Amino acid sequence: MALTKYVLGELLDRNTEYNDQLKFGTENVRGVLNTKGISDTRVSVDTRDLSKFLVVRPGGFIFNHRVHDKLGLGYNTSNDVYIFTNDYVAFYVKPEMAKNVLLPDYLYIWYLRPEFDRYMLFKTYGSATLFFNWDNMCELEIELPDITIQRKFVAIYKAMVANQQSYERGLEDLKLVCDGYIEDLRRKMQCAPIGDFIGQSKEKNSDGLITLEQGINIEKKFITPQRSNDNFYGRQIVRTGQIAYCTQLNNANIAVALRTGPDCIVSSVYDVIFIKDQTKLLPEYLMIWLSRREFGRFVYWASQGTSYEFLSYENLAGYKIPVPDIHVQEAIASIYNCYIRRREINEQLKAQIKDICPILIKGSLEESAKA
């Protein structure tokens, strides 16, 4: 069964449906990710004219014509209607083509491959800002197997996604249990400033023995810093069980993390705290509170500065939390740690699904060639 070569322009229709009747509001506004997904928008649209937003119905595709290293693209697999700013380009697979030539789900798998982003970059134009427009999309060539083979490999992909989503739903249930305990404590207990339980560590790497350099991201994780410095002497040490945070703030998403790995060093933009008595307060329990959005709002309110916002140790120490019996803390921390481990597994499942997309496309082409 031979493969058939097309250019995408033969298979796609551009979507020019706008929200001119204002049927859809701010709750329908979405954005796209360069990981090829649709997400809640990160910017305020309260002052925007929603009548000029593009309407994307189930089965529709959307992409941002401004490009970085990857194309921001999404596929509406939900039963909901979304709207996007007119900075985006929307399209559908032509109905007659979707029946017998190209499944929209198969096209989405094709987009998920890293090969697509590499080819897309080759087709971009611009200097300071790269662009990939509708005409560029239509010029792309695609080899397609028979529709029955497409259905087979789409079914494999959907089964993997369904398994991951089922796992994710259980993950959110676990988080609800943890959040429920936290909220119940806050209602029933008097809160105390964390300054009563913590101290500020100022231990320096004076002898240069620690060479593991780390940074912290807004996902509350230690990471390898983007910029490295070979001079390890005099850097701030973070011991296992201590908490480090970035004193410079851009917004309420503070970079803070509990060190669970080996001792490391961080740059001078970080402060380090330790628990004075772990029979009264567990670092894992404290970290649960420092991971909550309300803590981000607190530090943004408590920070100081003009051009840059800074969080001092004194302001941090004023944050109040309920501090229950240590056994209650252990129980809550155990549930939360289970949630964190499962969240990491869920991210691994997502990565595996994305990694298998090139294999699925290749497998479908090889099966078609053999038929």
Protein language model features and the residues they cover:
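Alpha-helix initiation and N-capping motif
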Residues: 5, 104, 191, 266, ...
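Internal, well-ordered alpha/beta segment that forms a basic, Gly-enriched binding/recognition surface
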Residues: 116
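Sequence-specific dsDNA recognition surfaces
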Residues: 5-61, 196-243
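A short glycine-rich beta-alpha junction/loop motif
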Residues: 82-89, 125-148, 264-271, 304-330
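Non-catalytic DNA-recognition/assembly elements of restriction-modification systems
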Residues: 1-19, 139-206, 216-217, 322-371
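Short, solvent-exposed alpha-helical surface patches in well-structured domains
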Residues: 106, 119, 139, 149-152, ...
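A short beta-sheet element
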Residues: 58, 63-112, 244-291
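Non-catalytic, surface-exposed connector residues within folded enzymatic/regulatory domains
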Residues: 23, 100-101, 131, 280, ...
